[in-house]
Amino acid sequence: SNKYADRGELFEGLEIWEDEKYREIQGTYPVIFFSFAKIKQTTYKETIEKIKKIIFDLYQEYAFIGKWDGLTDKEKENFNNISYDMSDVIAQEAIVDLSNYLSRYYGKKVIILLDEYDTPMQEAYVNGFWDELASFTRSLFNSTFKTNPYLERAIMTGITRVSKESVFSDLNNLEVVTTTSNKYMTASGFTEEEGFNSLEKFGYGDKKEEIKKWYDGFVFGKITDIYNPWSILNFLDKGKIDTYWANTSSNGLVSKLVREGDADLKSVFEELLKGKNILCPIDEQIVYNQLDDDSEAVWSLLLASGYLKVVSIEKKVVGKRQLYELSLTNMEVLDMFYDMVRGWFKKSAGNYNAFVKALLINDVEAMNEYMNVISEEIFSNFDVGTKPSKLQPERFYHGFVLGLLVDLAEDYIVTSNRESGF
C-alpha cells in the first residue's frame, strides 16, 4: 500500500525483501482494504446497514480525496453523499467509484482486499434472508470486481467457497484457492517447523506433542502438519491449552446444519466424535440455498471451514464428486464439537419430562419411580384393565410411554410397532 511508501524497514530481514521485484513495488499501489468479518447481524436490514457503514468508513479514510481539485464538482458531490443511509444502488457502486478516484490521484490502478466475504452470507442463511442478501452482494461484487476498469487485482478470503452461481455469476477470471489446492500451501498456517521453533523460543519446548494433538492436523494441498496460527499465538500468549478457535469461524452455520440434519447425518457425526473416519463425496462449492436438501453438503462445508481434514483421496468418484476419507482435524475441533453438542442439550433439557431425562442418563431407578408415581396417582382401572391376560392394558402402557418419548423425536429415531411382522 502507498500508505507505507518508504517503509522498507518493515520487511527487512524477511525472505520477501530479498526479491528485487517486490522491493520495487513496495508502497506504490493504492489499496482498498475492508472486512466483512464482524457482520453477524440477524436481519437483512441490519446487515445492509453494517455494509454501508463499512463503505462510509472507507470514504472517511480517504476524505482528502473529496477535496482534490482533480475531481469534478459532480464527483465531489457524489463523494460527500456517501453516508450510512445511502441507497442500495449508491452503496453497490461506491467501491468502484472510490477505485476511480484513487487511481487518478495516485496514477496507478488499485488493489482491493476483502476479508471474510462470506460471513454475512452465513448469517443470512442461518437467519432466513439469504436470497435478499445474495442479490445485493451479486450487484456489489459485479461493479467492484468485474466492471471496474481501475482494478489492478483483487483478493477475497472466506471461510467457505460460495458457489459461482450464488454471488459470482457475473465475474470472470476467478482463480480459486482452497484447502485442497497446491498453491499457497504454507501460507495459511504455521508449518511444524515454524510452530515448534516458536514453542522453543517461548520456553514451551516440552509441550510439542500436546500442541501437535490440539492444533496440528490442517492439510493444504500436499502439505500436512499445518498448525492453527490463531491457537498457537494464543497459547504462546497465555501458556494454556484451550479451544481458542471455537468462536472465530462458522460455528452457527455448522450447528444449524448438524442439529437440523436427518438421522443418517447425525449418525455419521457421532462416528466423527468417536474418533472414526468417514468416507463421502465432496463438492468444494457451497450452494447455500441447497444445503437443506443435500445432507452431504455439510461435510463439504466442514472440510472447507477447517473442521475436517483429508486423510486420503479415494480413486472412486460419486457422480462428478471426488470421494474423500475425512476425520476431525484435531483435539481443539473435537473439544469444540463436544461443547456444541452439550449446548444443544442444555438448551433443550428444560423441555424434556422427568422420565426422558432419566432415560438419557440411564437412571433406571428414577424411571421406575416416575412410572410408579404416575400409575398410582393418575391411572384408572378403566385405563389399565383388571385382567393381565388382556391386550388392552399393554396397549395403554405402550401408548403412554410412546407419548413420553415424543420429546426426543427431533434428536432420536422413535418408532412404534412398525408393521414388520413381529
Features from the language model and the residues they span:
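Structural recognition of the conserved hydrophobic beta-strand(s) that form the central parallel beta-sheet
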Residues: 33, 111-115, 135, 139, ...
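Short regulatory helix/loop adjacent to the ATP-binding pocket of P-loop NTPases
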Residues: 44, 145-151, 162-180
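Extended alpha-helical interface modules used as scaffolds for assembling large macromolecular complexes
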Residues: 174-175, 226-422
